[in-house]
Structure formats: C-alpha cells, structure tokens
Amino acid sequence: MKRFSTIILALVACATLSAQQVYRTEFSVFDLREAALRNDHSKTERHIRFAPKTIEAVGKVEVVGQTVNMPTAWSDYNVYLHIQNTIKAYDLVVNEQLVASVEDSYTPADFLLSPYLRQGDNEILLLLRRSQSIELHNGSKSNLVEQFRGSYLFAQHRKHIFDYDARIVESGKTLNLELDIAVRNDFNFEEVVQVGYDIYSPENKLIDYAVREFPVAGRTIDTLRIRTSLGEESRFLWSDKNPKLYRLTLYTKRDGKPREYISFRLGAGTSTFADGKLLRNGKAITVKSARYNARTTYNEALAEIKALKATGVNILLPDNPQPEWFYDICDGLGIYVVERANINPDENSTNRKIGGTPSNNPELVGEYLARVKAMYYRTRNHSCIVAYALGGDAAGNGYNMYKAYQWLKGVEKQRAVICTSADGEWNTDIDRIE
C-alpha cells in the first residue's frame, strides 16, 4: 500500500503528460498474411492481451495492473500498448515511471512503452480516477462493455511501418492508388527498410504488388509515397449504394521474409462538401441520419446497423469515438459516419465569457486539441467517414473550438469539419447534419 500511495501522491503533483501517446491509424500487426486477413492474433507471437486486475484503492483512485514478461528476443522491438474501455480517466505507469495522463476515457489510445521497459517482468499500472476535465463529458454516452475489452500490447521491429494514409482517387475514368507509408527507424544509423504492399480488387483480383527499398535516417520517421493506377474501374466507386472495397496489405521484409502484416479495406472515391451539403464522389448525399453508439459486441452492432440501413438510414451520428470494428462494419455495409470528438460539455454552452463555456476557456485548449487529434488520426483511413464533428450539439463555441477547427482543417483537405454549436460563426463547414 505504501509504495502505491507514494506513486499516486507524486503523480498528483505532476503536470498532464502525454508525450508517449502515439497518434496514428489504429492497427495491429500479424505474423502471417492469412491471420491478418482473418484478424486472428492467435498465432501472432508478439501480441499480448492487456486485462489488468484490481490491486488496491487509494482514496478515490483505483490501481489496476498487469505484470508482463519481456523476453530478450524483444530487445530489437518497439512495444506499444493499446488501451480502450477504461471507463475512467487514467494515469499510465510502467515500472514506477509515469508514461501518460489521459483525461478522455472514451477515445482508444496507443502508447510507446519501450523507453520504460526492461528484460524480464514489467509492472504496468493504470491509476483510474475522476477526469480533471469532467465538464467535457457531461453529454457523453458510455459504451456498455466489459472494462478494458480490446486492450492489448504488441511489438513492432525497430524498423517498421509506423502509419499509413491511403486513398483511391478518380482521375477521369481511371482509379489511382495514393498510398503514403510512414516508416520508422529507431536504430542510431541510417537503415534500408524493405516495405511491401499488394492490393486486391473488390472481386478479389490481384491488381498490383511491389517491394520497395527505402533508406531511413537513424531515429527518424520518413514517408514512402506510392502512386499506381488501378485501371478504368469507376464501377467500384464506394458509396452507400455500392459498398465495394479493395483490400490492401502492407508488410516489411527482413532476412528475405515478409514480416508484420497490416491488412485493411479501402473504398474508392472521395467525400467532400459544397454549398452546405455532403458529397460522395461529387454527388450530394440525400441524408437520412440516426444517432447511434456501438454499446455491445461486433455481432450485435452488425445486426443493429443492418436493421437501421433496412429502414433507409444512411448516416450514423455517434456521440464520441467508437471501437475500430464499428467503422469496419460501416465500410462493409455502406453506411456513412460523421465522426465526433469526445467534446460534450452541455452546461453554460451559451455563456461566451472567457471561461463561461468550457469551449471558451483557453486553459482547456490543449485538451480540446488532444481529443480532436486522437479522433482524427485513428480512423481517417475509413471510407465510411464523410465528415468530422468537433463536439456535441450543445458544446458551445469560442477559442478552443476555433483552434480545433483550424487544426483539423490543416490536416484534412477534403471532408467537412462541423461545429454544430458555431451559432453562425466561421468555424464550421456545414451547420448541422439532420
């Protein structure tokens, strides 16, 4: 008890820390191609379920943890922790070192743990507590799921695919793949990384494949840009009425063998906006929307979303970021999604004095930006997402929403950014989705 009490008292005095939080597409890696296609980690060597158990309570803080053994064979690997469904805000502590403090319990997050790990047993703790920005959660909707479900550790070689940004765009009658792969080299000197990819059509026909040798300076991330034609295939443009998906698989090669497969599906075409309307492939979307949050399991959500689509619903409006598989379902069924950051203060929304509404309290601007950033990067490669919402309908407006809008417009060049509480101001592309 004394050791944990000491840790917690020390953390109370610390400023919010999130330096090791990783903002990127949500994915994990597989040892075998077939496993990646099935999303089956049973034969992935460096993938460990994270299911911490309660250790003790110190005041209003619940300490949960798990001991994880790091064998010598993992020394050339970066170890990441994916956390979701924490229910409460948390501090992440590894071997008595603070890794990150997270106020948003609704948005899944990844963390780089390698700087804090050692060979042998490692103690990974979460200190579950009340959020220091609880006012941002007043209008949030809880997902009724098992705590920590879907959390895991996984490892990637120190030369690895760190992230990717994939698009299939139409040029005339031709579809073109635009694939940007962020490659990370955590060795001290320049290394050549072999990066492979292949792409299959919605009819399961191999269209293109290649392995590129890509030099990356030591301790840096660089971007490999791939541009290739997929042919005159406008019949495969993705929409709610034509949910055709390509299959891309990325991997690295070491010692002549493919490693660390990442597989995902991608729809062709673009989501844009004009004159206050959402567009898919240049055509206005006739909106029939429904508020929806995935509160159960994949199979139950699949059945619920199918039922909604059968009634004519074509756009879902979640209240906060959803499990990654929710977006897979929507990609596959042809359901549009307006992705929404977990910014849901519903008190004092009309009080525009500084500090009146949380959205006009500059002390919270870092938290607003962190939530928008986490929302955007993890799901930006999903075709179903046609727009981004900065927060709830009663979130208010002000300095923090201005900054959030500016940041998101700086990274997202096509899809609409919506602030439904803009109240006639400049920081929204569309007033609201009905």
Give the residues covered by each predicted segment.
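Secreted/periplasmic carbohydrate-active enzymes, especially glycoside hydrolases
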Residues: 1-10, 18-324, 328-332, 386-387, ...
